[in-house]
Amino acid sequence: MVAFSSLFLGASIAATALAAPGELPGMHLNKRQTYTQSATGTHDGYYFSFWTDGGPNVRYTNEAGGQYSVTWSGNGNWVGGKGWNPGAARTINYTGTYQPNGNSYLAVYGWTRNPLVEYYVVENFGTYDPSTGAQRLGSINVDGSTYNVYRTRRTNAPSIEGTRSFDQYWSVRVNKRVGGSVDMNAHFNAWRQAGLTLGTHDYQIVATEGYFSSGSARINVGGGSTGGGNNGGGNNGGNPGGNPGGNPGGNPGGNCSPRWGQCGGQGWNGPTCCESGTTCRQQNQWYSQCL
């Protein structure tokens, strides 16, 4: 996705500005389909987007209806999921399993144009909070939890319009979960009240992302009623991929952090050593990782 943010300088460096191919005309796949390279399209009634920088070992599979599954490991960044194009102020229902080991998140993810904005409603993440280092603009109580609202800025980064500078809007759920209803109209209104302006909607998916990590997920996406807000849209000419400028953290566990785990960074109170065969490497001022 361009998936975590300028917030996270490490991913900005690690994730290249590769754009996945645009959706091909008539690309309607009605059977189980597995990808290991970037792709976008329509599958069994849902839009899908899958992006990888080519580094990790990742297998993304479109399954029946709104369901997809993914397994991943290794060095690099990827992001994928199912949803809609265009996005809208809809209520999104989803269920599934999500088992990350290290840097990862689960979120409703999308873009708007005019202005160009990348946005996230983060439902779950690894052991590194994607809002680390960002300025909190407020909060919203919806869908059984508080979500804190943030804005970050990316400069000369990959986007659905090529290499551009743009804002990122974030709602980060305090009580992490896997499954439930996400009222996007409520989040859009909260962002508007915080002075964050959205444009014409491009795609909107329930995304899983991994960055120098491993794990697996199976997510089933559904839709609900559409609320207010800008439902205009258009098909993105290319998916910049999930380049999460975000560096979610690893799992410390034990006396030393395991491979992919966090081992340092401003505000880190966990282990600063790494398991045998790995080295603690600084990604940015907020995050160091065992690689």
Swiss-Prot record:
Presence of keyword Lipid biosynthesis: no
Temperature-related behavior of activity: Optimum temperature is 50 degrees Celsius.
Activity: how regulated: The activity iss completely inhibited by Hg(2+), a metal ion that interacts with Trp and oxidizes the indole ring, and is significantly enhanced by beta-mercaptoethanol, which counteracts the oxidation effects of the S-S linkage between Cys residues.
UniProt keyword terms in alphabetical order: Carbohydrate metabolism, Glycoprotein, Glycosidase, Hydrolase, Polysaccharide degradation, Secreted, Signal, Xylan degradation
GO biological process: xylan catabolic process
Signal peptide location: 1-19
Record has Secreted as a keyword: yes
Catalytic activity: Endohydrolysis of (1->4)-beta-D-xylosidic linkages in xylans
Domain CBM1: 255-291
Pathway assignment: Glycan degradation; xylan degradation
Region (Disordered): 223-246
Biotechnology: The SDS tolerance and neutral to alkaline preference are important for application in the detergent and textile solutions. Moreover, its alkaline-active, cellulose activity-free characteristics make XYN11B preferred for biobleaching of paper pulp.
Localization per Swiss-Prot or TrEMBL: Secreted
Gene3D superfamilies, alphabetized: 2.60.120.180
GO molecular function: cellulose binding; endo-1,4-beta-xylanase activity
Enzyme Commission identifier(s): 3.2.1.8
pH dependence (UniProt free text): Optimum pH is 6.0.
UniProt cross-references to Pfam families, sorted A to Z: CBM_1 (PF00734), Glyco_hydro_11 (PF00457)
Cross-referenced PROSITE patterns: CBM1_1, CBM1_2, GH11_1, GH11_2, GH11_3
Positions of the GH11 domain: 34-222
The family this protein is said to belong to: Belongs to the glycosyl hydrolase 11 (cellulase G) family.
Function recorded in the entry: Endo-1,4-beta-xylanase involved in the hydrolysis of xylan, a major structural heterogeneous polysaccharide found in plant biomass representing the second most abundant polysaccharide in the biosphere, after cellulose. Shows maximum activity on soluble wheat arabinoxylan (defined as 100%), moderate activity on birchwood xylan (80.5%) and beechwood xylan (76.2%), and weak activity on insoluble wheat arabinoxylan (7.0%). Has no activity towards glucan or carboxymethyl cellulose-sodium (CMC-Na).
Record note on domains: The CBM1 domain assists the catalytic domain to bind to insoluble and crystalline polysaccharides and is thus required for enzyme activity on insoluble substrates.
Name of the protein described by the UniProt record: Endo-1,4-beta-xylanase 11B
Phylogenetic placement of the source organism: Eukaryota, Fungi, Dikarya, Ascomycota, Pezizomycotina
